[in-house]
A protein has these predicted regions:
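C-terminal substrate-binding/catalytic lobe of Rossmann-fold NAD(P)-dependent dehydrogenases
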Residues: 22-28, 36-197
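Rossmann-like NAD(P)(H) cofactor-binding subdomain of soluble oxidoreductases
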Residues: 1-42
C-alpha cells in the first residue's frame, strides 16, 4: 500500500520510469516537481509584495524545468488576484525567475543543487499522504485523457491523500496558459522518449 514519491531529476522522466519499474498502480506513483516550483513562485510573490508566503496561493503546471507553466490567473494573496496587487511587468519577472529558480540555486551554491527546498516539498507530500490530509498540490501525475494527455506523467493539481493521487483536478486552461502547457507536455514526452523510459 505504499506510495512512491519520485524526487530525482530529470523528474519528468524519472517518475515515468518509477511507475514502469515499480509495477504500482498510477495513483501510487507521484512526482514532486510542481510542489517545489509552486512554492518558489509563492515565495517570489511574497517577497515582492512584502507579505507572508502563507497568504500566497499559486500553481505551477507542466514539466519540471524551463517549460514549466506558472499560472498567474490562479495566483492570489489572501484571496486577492495577484494582478490587482502588482504590475504585469513585475509578474512576468517573477514568472521568469520561477522558471529559472533551480539554475539560480545551482549558481549560488557553486557545487551541487538545491536540497532543502526539495526536501521540504517531499515532506509536504509525505505528510499529506501519511496523514490523509487530502491536500491539493501540483504534482507529476499520470494522465489518462485529462488535459488532453494520455499515458504521460505531467505536473497538474491533484488531491494527495492516503490513496496517493486520489484525483486529478482538471483546470480549464486558455490562451497562453494552454499553449504553454501543451508545449511543456511535448517537451516532457520528448525527454521521456529520449531516455527510453
Amino acid at each position: 500500500d505504499c506510495v512512491l514519491v519520485v524526487v530525482s531529476n530529470p523528474l519528468d522522466a524519472m517518475v515515468q520510469h518509477g511507475h514502469g519499474v515499480s509495477g504500482f498502480p498510477k495513483n501510487r506513483v507521484v512526482g514532486m516537481a510542481g510542489v517545489l516550483d509552486s512554492t518558489r513562485f509563492r515565495s517570489f510573490v511574497a517577497w515582492e509584495l512584502g507579505v507572508s508566503v502563507r497568504d500566497v496561493t499559486a500553481l505551477v503546471l507542466g514539466g519540471h524545468g524551463d517549460t514549466m507553466v506558472p499560472l498567474v490567473d490562479y495566483c492570489t494573496v489572501a484571496g486577492i488576484p495577484v494582478r490587482k496587487l502588482m504590475s504585469e511587468e513585475k509578474i512576468q519577472a517573477i514568472v521568469k525567475r520561477t522558471k529559472g529558480a533551480g539554475g539560480e540555486v545551482v549558481g549560488l551554491l557553486k557545487t551541487g543543487s538545491a536540497f532543502v527546498s526539495p526536501a521540504m516539498s517531499a515532506l509536504e507530500m509525505a505528510e499529506s499522504i501519511l496523514k490523509d490530509q487530502k491536500r491539493v498540490l501540483a504534482c507529476a501525475c499520470k494522465l489518462d485523457g485529462e488535459y488532453g494527455v494520455d499515458g504521460l506523467y505531467v505536473g497538474v493539481p491533484c488531491v494527495l491523500g492516503a490513496g496517493g493521487i486520489e484525483r486529478v483536478i482538471e483546470l480549464e486552461l486558455e490562451g497562453d496558459d494552454k499553449k504553454a502547457f501543451d508545449e511543456s507536455v511535448v517537451h516532457v514526452k520528448a525527454l521521456v522518449d529520449q531516455l527510453d523510459v
